[in-house]
């Protein structure tokens, strides 16, 4: 069992502590599924106001469900469909204030109100997966979350391939 000292007082401190902890976790394991699982658990445990966090792995032209924390989720998402599929197809971060107004949104959990999806790139800049964070609070994610989660996923991407 791991024990971490993570300060959740401010987003800046939270993301700094998460980054340090994630680097420690990843340095101990080479398996990509184990690393995604621990990353999802770390974020789920310390980031407030989330109702789902997890990974979709890029396999051909689909995103296939990977390790996650939260309710049962959609298993297969085509590139270009919904927030996750759009992030994978465009290679761009999707920060959605209100998922109910997002075109082509896939609703796996009707209680989700906002969503942040970040593509995870490997060493050759290929998209390996996306991380999907969902919140029941509209407008939950801001520029600090985008920056902080992006740094976490840059580190994870180096360990995934």
Curated annotation (Swiss-Prot):
GO terms for molecular function: L-methionine-(R)-S-oxide reductase activity. SUPFAM superfamilies: GAF domain-like. One of its GO terms (cellular component) is cytosol. Pfam families: GAF_2 (PF13185). InterPro entries: FRMsr_CS, GAF, GAF-like_dom_sf, Phosphatase_reg/MetRdx. Belongs to the free Met sulfoxide reductase family. This is Protein ZMO0507. It comes from Zymomonas mobilis subsp. mobilis (strain ATCC 31821 / ZM4 / CP4).
């Amino acid at each position: 069992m791991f024990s971490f000292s993570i300060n959740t007082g401010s987003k800046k401190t939270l993301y700094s502590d998460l980054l340090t902890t994630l680097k420690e976790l990843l340095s101990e394991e080479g398996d990509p599924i184990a690393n995604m699982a621990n990353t999802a658990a770390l974020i789920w445990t310390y980031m407030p106001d989330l109702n789902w966090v997890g990974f979709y792995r890029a396999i051909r032209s689909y995103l296939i469900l990977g390790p996650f924390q939260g309710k049962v989720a959609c298993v297969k998402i085509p590139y270009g469909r919904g927030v996750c599929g759009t992030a994978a197809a465009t290679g761009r971060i999707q920060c959605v204030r209100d998922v109910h107004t997002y075109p082509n949104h896939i609703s796996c959990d009707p209680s989700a109100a906002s969503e942040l999806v970040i593509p995870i790139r490997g060493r050759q800049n290929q998209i390996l997966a996306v991380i999907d964070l969902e919140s029941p609070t509209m407008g939950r994610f801001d520029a600090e979350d985008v920056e902080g989660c992006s740094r976490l996923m840059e580190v994870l991407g180096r360990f995934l391939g």
